[in-house]
Amino acid sequence: MNSLQSLCVLCARLNECALDLECLKFCDPVIVLSDMANFKKNGIVILHLYQTFFEGIKEQNLLCASALTVYMQVLLKAMYEQVLLLDAALESFMVDQDRKKYFEKVLCLRRCAEHLSINISLNNGVEFIVQLSTLNDIEQLISKINSVYALLLPQEGLQICGKIIDLLTIMCGACMVAKPESYLETKTCMKCYEELTLTPNQGKSLRRRLHGKFCNHLTEQKAFFNIEKNIETIEKDLGEAILNYGTVQSVATEIKKIFKQQRSAESLHVSDAEKTLKKYNIFSKVPDVIYSLSEFTYWSKISETIVRNVAITLQQLNSCHTLYKQLQNDVSLYLYGEVSEDFLALSENLLTHDERLYVGSIYVSPSRLIDLVTGLSIKNLEESPIFKRLAEEDEVQHKIKSLLHDIRDPQTTETPGRLNTINCMLQTHNLQQEVLARKKAYFQKVSESGYNRVMACIREQESLINKVVSVNVYGNFIFEALSKIMNGFVLRKMYLDGSFRVDSCTYDEHLYIKNNLMPKKLPLELLPDLSEIMYTLLTGPLSDFHKSAYPLPANISMAYGCDHAEMLPHMKEDLARCIEGTIHPSVWMVCEYNEFFNFSGVTDVNDMQKKMWNFIRELTLSVALYNDVFGKRLKIVRIDEEGDLSGNVVLTFNHESPLLFHTGGGMTKFKDVYSLLYCDLQAQLSRETVDVPEGVSYSVRTPNLLDLVRENEQDGSIIPGCLFDE
């Protein structure tokens, strides 16, 4: 077992312990005190694990972070603080015996620490404050950091990530079950954008496609079914002695009786149709009427799923809750000699009837509540005179019944055919009957349209309630995104702290390259590829759709990153125009000597972004023009690119050393693009220089047209001899 596998095993065991620790917060403190020895023993184990692993994992995240190590840092710190808080609260409860004060202290009800104001400072001193209070705010901040990734100093970026981890420790706590107030289910994340890239947009904008979508990445929904029906499992766990105590056995029997009353799953006409269809198979001669019956039976089953038949009522849920509570009290009397008063028992009397419906019960699965709410909504709809169609027999059911009647009692007389043209022309036109028929058809159409809209609304609200009421756990996307951003800043910090040679080029070398490139023009056919290179350099480490298994163009990755960071449309237009480029160097050669990636004097974030785009454009187009003029193959790579970086221009985004280039003596840092290009040109010339021994002379022959003549063409028939140099 390697270290990563060992860390995964430790994380799994810590999760198991964290769930038990979280449940203790809601338990009756008297019950916890009755087994205080085990609590102390497990608490010592948690303290030992914290002291053993926490600092090492924290250092690991500052070198090479992963979603697992970031989560482990959050989990260990939260469990450590939770154990100390529980121990202090239990000590106070032993003195005052006040359950209300105990729960206020354990659950932190008198204070809210799940808010954070982060002061972000860019590399030129521009500062602004960001307020964080939910997981969506954290994810949105990470997306915005990804958008201005190049404008943040690596130390500042790592400091911000550290504050986010501290907030996640407070917000998530020791348990992965998400608090309802810690997230907004209707706000999408970057992962939602990534999912939409795999499906066609059908001409719809991204914002329209995201409208009404519920995010299941920051918090993942977990479905729990039939919790209330696990009475058999509870009986096995209680044992024979507890079952024979008081009314335990009788209460368990009453709970079993509640859910024995089930409604019929199918309508009567569907059952009759299926009995008739069983007589036919693929080898039978199937009449047309049987084929029609089969088709209508299929559509009838599909339509019945729209209106859900809820197999449980509100009265049954209330009875179930009351009986389970009585069972809990009886078991508590047997084990501890008194009725337990946990947090839920103390706060139950404070809830209204509507609040109880949405808060639910610990004895009933959330899916039951969702079915109940949906059923009550549809029942209320049925009582409306406008939508009586819900309670009436629909056309599919009527057609199935008529087909069954025709099969059982076939008619001997043929149905009258359609009247011929002459008879139709001779018939008297009944205007009143036609008006009534058209009015009925119009009302039917309006009713169906309204019905479909109402049912679509019910389904949408059902999805929302399902997300809110069901159990949600914290997803791993927030930890993955945070680890990617941290690794980018860590890599930049390594290059910032590294010892590199300083370029020895002067202003004359800068001017030499610039003067050689300025009169030239960039080939027009290179601009599309150069635009993709610029988008690749500007895209933050989080928007890596162009590196995925199904890669997208770099401009799409940049567009999704800008959209989710909520960049204004006019800024996106400025970015697109800047990246388009031009073949004339006088337009984009604007950087002064040793001023590359220098933002001094800029006091606005938007202006800083525009200046950064101009820097990247000048770097990309200058290198491309240099390659075209001098016949080079120099490439620009980011520091987070995989592979060998030697021989390429390395872009670090650091203010002190924005460019690195590997020369013969090692890495050299540059703050000027054209000095770097001169260094590459000089290194190439030095490699091509050959030392000539003393006393050896070479005569250089003047080239002439005879060098191009084939052997069989030297007779002068093709190239006149007068053109040859004698």
UniProtKB/Swiss-Prot annotation:
Zn finger residue spans: C3H1-type: 189-217
Keywords on record: ATP-binding, Host nucleus, Late protein, Metal-binding, Nucleotide-binding, Viral genome packaging, Viral release from host cell, Zinc, Zinc-finger
MF terms in GO: ATP binding; zinc ion binding
Cellular component, GO, one term: host cell nucleus
Domain of life: Viruses
Pfam families the record matches: PRTP
Annotated positions binding ATP: Y626, N627, D628, V629, F630, G631, K632, R633
InterPro entries: UL28/UL56
Main subcellular localisation: host cell
GO BP: viral DNA genome packaging
Subcellular location: Host nucleus
Subunit relationships: Associates with TRM2 and TRM3 to form the tripartite terminase complex. Interacts with portal protein.
Function: Component of the molecular motor that translocates viral genomic DNA in empty capsid during DNA packaging. Forms a tripartite terminase complex together with TRM2 and TRM3 in the host cytoplasm. Once the complex reaches the host nucleus, it interacts with the capsid portal vertex. This portal forms a ring in which genomic DNA is translocated into the capsid. TRM1 carries an endonuclease activity that plays an important role for the cleavage of concatemeric viral DNA into unit length genomes.
Family: Belongs to the herpesviridae TRM1 protein family.
Protein name: Tripartite terminase subunit 1
